[in-house]
């Protein structure tokens, strides 16, 4: 899996990859062939930083509709030779989701492609989930034979079938197929086996047992670390349940590193909640300074942690970043300068895609730091993360007087529903594009309810929208 190559933000391709509203507006104004080429590149080479979190499918599907775009490129991608060897969901997931939205909008060619791919494609389960939401009963029943043929009548095949039934996001196709006398017995057995497997996992936990003490919890955490599965967070919860007052010296010693790395991480995560105002705990966090210690500090939010954050915020390491994030989330007006400085330094040093920016951008908006507007605008334009851009839009709504007449307008076409919601609440209707767009969002059955609620709050009998 390769990292996506993101084009410059001022290009049509770069705008579409980022999912910006200006991407749609520029595509509709560009030559159709150029717009379709950029759109197809985005759909076939997923540009998202985190494909499990960021949204693009509805955004691209709407643009296919506006451009009356053919689906030949998507078809070639789905049924190409790579599909025989690359079974990763990420390769075809975005294209299948786009087809799902197009099918909802009445594009029969998209529906037919989904059916074909569900019958023969490697990522058939994703296509089937899309069809479960959009196809009729007859269409779904026609897929029973090719889908079930994937699972041979062997012990291994039946186990795979039980897992597929158990893990399906949408149970509708499987329920329909179970109604058929041809498949009822086999699918009923698969469903029951899946339920039994789930019950069996719940009944055979591998974690703590009654009667465990502090040392047993530390040993469990150490065993997890040896197996490559850090368990210090659940171990800290166990520690809270089993620790007695007389165990405090042993826990403090473990937090200082006397019992190994896993025990130290477990003890620190326990102490930051058990003794949040104890300066000695913060000293232990600072002395450790590693990832578990920083994660433990991030769970603190009291006055002592804030006081220490004001001292640590200038550090160039992860503890300094955690201190800045805490001030952004919990600090007061007097901390605005520190948050602004951290925001500027992070953009300057790590660029507009740094994960550290999420908390700092939120903090700039929460504290209404007007001086942050220029750097927030830079983050908005340049970041490849649509989630971070949405946070920047919310922060700009609180800090930038020009937001309503500027970025808020293009945000009505953004790929993220939360960003469209912000735009629907703030975009100035003096712009001739705003009123028609609000009406379209209000009438679009694919639009999210929160966005439509925001639109309805703007469409009143007294308004001109």
Where are the language model's segments positioned?
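Charged, amphipathic alpha-helical stretches
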Residues: 1-77
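Amphipathic alpha-helical scaffolding segments comprising HEAT/armadillo-like alpha-solenoid repeats
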Residues: 9, 35-45, 69-84, 105-116, ...
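Substrate-recognition/specificity elements adjacent to catalytic centers across diverse enzyme folds
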Residues: 21-26, 30-32, 133, 138-177
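N-terminal nucleotide-handling cores and adjacent loading/scaffold lobes of large enzymes
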Residues: 56-65, 82-83, 95-102
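Charged, low-complexity intrinsically disordered segments
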Residues: 149-153, 161, 166, 170-203, ...
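C-terminal structured domain segments
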Residues: 388-396, 404-447
